A protein has these predicted regions:
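A donor-sugar binding/catalytic signature common to diverse glycosyltransferases
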Residues: 7-15, 156-199
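Structural alpha-helical scaffold elements that stabilize or flank donor/cofactor-binding regions
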Residues: 28, 86, 161-162
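C-terminal "capping" alpha-helix adjacent to the active site of nucleotide-linked donor transferases
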Residues: 203-220
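Nucleotide-activated donor-binding/catalytic signature segment of Leloir-type glycosyltransferases, i.e.
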Residues: 138-155
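Conserved catalytic-core segment of nucleotide-activated headgroup transferases in glycan assembly
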Residues: 64-142, 236, 240-242
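C-terminal amphipathic helix plus adjacent low-complexity
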Residues: 216-281
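Catalytic cores of nucleotide-enabled group-transfer and carboxylate-activating enzymes in metabolic
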Residues: 43, 78, 92, 143, ...
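Active-site and donor-binding regions of nucleotide-sugar-utilizing enzymes
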Residues: 1-73
Length: 281
């Protein structure tokens, strides 16, 4: 949310993901000429802020990572079918917890994951964040080594591959949740701190299997997932980046390239402290 204000050019805010609940997501720091939003939910909020501040525009483009998702949506289908065939299972569940010791489900959910795999004829694939405590990594790797229906994925492969392969996601408080929901697939969390919950959240590990069944079949749960797709980012058309380029060109065509933005001394100081000064000569 900060840029080197002294560099020439149109300043465009492109978001990292869908973290609408982060405290600074809606803070306007006056650095940007236009905001490229992911979907109607974000657009409506930023359009209201644009009316309030009066010095930036808003364009709904979608999130650029969705172009990659579109291009690779079925790239790993063969890998998925191979895993299911080798394990003799019918469905693939991804367990992707956060690494934060305060927020992670890792100390509590292991045995219930094993029960879920066994009772619902599922292969549970586990992919951990690189910053996960080594003791948890070692514990789960050793546990999975003795099971045919649990697969531990070591470092090196991106979690997005397994998101595309999975039928269901189990997590806690992770950035992967919204990305998976946008595939219109079920999500179950244990003890999430999210305030607006559009998926199944449980407070006890023993509730996992019931929540799994509910997420797959309940009409209200399915409708909530569709609401996220429709409002957070409906642009799985492969044209997000092109809309962004067109939007930037259109802004310059209408306004030219602004020489500078009106910033108070604090914003200028913050920018310089973050990025440094341009050294002349």
């Amino acid at each position: 949310n900060i840029v080197p204000y002294y560099l020439p050019g149109v300043k465009i805010q492109v978001f990292h993901g869908y973290a609408a609940e982060k405290k600074d997501h809606w803070i306007i720091r006056r650095y940007f000429d236009t905001y490229f939003t992911q979907g109607p939910y974000f657009t409506s909020h930023f359009e209201a802020l644009a009316k309030k501040y009066g010095d930036f525009e808003v364009l709904e483009t979608g999130w650029p990572k969705q172009d990659w998702i579109k291009a690779n949506l079925h790239k790993y289908d063969a890998d998925r079918e191979k895993l299911l065939k080798e394990s003799g299972k019918e469905t693939l569940i991804l367990y992707a917890p956060t690494f934060s010791p305060k927020l992670t489900s890792l100390p509590y959910i292991k045995e219930e994951l094993g029960k879920l795999a066994k009772e619902r004829n599922a292969l549970v694939v586990m992919k951990f964040h690189p910053l996960t405590r080594q003791e948890w990594v070692d514990e789960y790797r050793e546990w999975a080594a003795n099971k045919k229906d649990v697969l531990f994925i070591d470092k090196g492969e991106n979690v997005t591959k397994y998101q595309l392969m999975a039928d269901t996601l189990i997590s806690d408080t992770s950035s992967t949740i919204y990305e998976f929901l946008l595939l219109s697939r079920p999500v179950i969390t244990l003890g999430t701190i999210s305030k607006d919950i559009y998926w199944e959240n449980i407070t006890e590990p023993g509730q996992l299997i019931a929540a799994y069944d509910h997420a797959l079949t309940d009409p209200e749960a399915i409708a909530k997932r569709q609401w996220i797709v429709d409002n957070y980012d409906p642009y799985l058309d492969g044209n997000v980046c092109q809309r962004m380029l067109d939007g930037a060109e259109d802004y310059i065509r209408r306004h030219g390239v602004p020489k500078k933005r009106k910033l108070n001394l604090w914003r200028k100081y913050t920018s310089i402290k973050t990025f440094g000064r341009i050294k002349k000569g």
